[in-house]
């Protein structure tokens, strides 16, 4: 399992186009970010407009390096797009609200802060914990751990001893996640 970072409408569109495209989808395994950003092409010595997905993987990796997958890969602490020179549009608060209400994660520019991911919604339409990227990534991490660490128990008898072996494997991991603010 993974979170797919989908590219929005082509470069040069507006907020309404970005929200309309996102509203046609419904998945807590995908996220959309908007608008496009300008980055340096170091090989050719020019600047290029690129879709957000070019940078978002780096944001997720940075988030995991300085925090954990269950922290929001967004905001001024973990969402700065260091390679971005500028966002295609300077979004107003109203633009950011419209995008976020439609499950499109705004890429905003703040004075003195640079270009920043300022949202962490999945494309899930129903309001729940799973409409957040960090919650989906937490569940992916937990599922992956449980699947890999308990696969040797799959064909064992369903006994109290087998269940206890499973708990002895999983509970320390969940305790660690909880101690790192992943679960409450």
Regions found by a protein language model. Give the residues of each.
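Structured, hydrophobic secondary-structure cores that serve as assembly/anchoring elements
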Residues: 1-184
